[in-house]
Amino acid sequence: MSNILTKILARKVEEIAERLLHVSQAELVARCADLPTPRGFAAALQATIAHGDPAVIAEIKKASPSKGVLREDFRPAEIAISYELGGASCLSVLTDVHFFKGHDDYLSQARDACTLPVLRKDFTIDPYQVYEARVLGADCILLIVAALDDAQLVDLSGLALQLGMDVLVEVHDIDELERAIQISAPLIGINNRNLSTFNVSLETTLTMKGLVPRDRLLVSESGILTSADVQRLRAAGVNAFLVGEAFMRAAEPGESLREMFFIT
């Protein structure tokens, strides 16, 4: 496990303990009973691909540990509207406070402003966070294989699916992919960023693509910065993408999305 991931997870344990002091897990469970049905996250991606278009998960991210603040003028609702107009199929919203300058409210603001399904992008290690994600309005959660053991992967993914959410299982190498395909989550995210060096290479997706079962949808994540990157991946049969940094640095995120994915 990388040094930065170790730090993030240690902080996450503290954060969960702090949140439990204010809202119990039992209270979150009770709230989940009265919520409307989630928007279909995997279904939205699959529908876009079936139409012949690239399925884009557009990310709303203020900052990252490696790059610092990406966008000073950060208005999640406006960004969400821009992404929907630009052709995004789904959204991803960072809610980690300490390392990514995210906030739970950013997810709610973004989701309320559009009709797109939303992924809660955070470091999920405990059932409490799965219930919390559902209460916040998330339609999908992220599970990072590098952060979890096999029992946690099974338990957390099963709980999310039971609550009606989808699960994006993120891997960085072949060993993690072999673990990921043992659970029934519909989405496999291949992160092109090396967690140890932070170097990014699209070869990670291209090398591992053939190992993803046909009944799972592969999502390529990180390092997709230009239309040439998109064309290279699409030529190899990759049809779903998670992109954040390139859009966050653009004056008009949705226009940047449209230019990267839909103007040839």
From Swiss-Prot:
Q: Identify the metabolic or biological route this protein is part of.
A: Amino-acid biosynthesis; L-tryptophan biosynthesis; L-tryptophan from chorismate: step 4/5
**What is the enzyme's class at the highest EC level?**
lyase
- Write down the species: Xylella fastidiosa (strain Temecula1 / ATCC 700964)
Write down the superkingdom of origin.
Bacteria
Instruction: Return the NCBIfam families for the record.
Output: PRK00278.1-2, PRK00278.1-6, PRK00278.2-4
Question: What is this enzyme's EC?
Answer: 4.1.1.48
Q: List the PANTHER family hit by this protein, alphabetically.
A: INDOLE-3-GLYCEROL-PHOSPHATE SYNTHASE (PTHR22854:SF2), TRYPTOPHAN BIOSYNTHESIS PROTEIN (PTHR22854)
GO BP annotations of the record are: L-tryptophan biosynthetic process
**The name this protein goes by in its record:** Indole-3-glycerol phosphate synthase
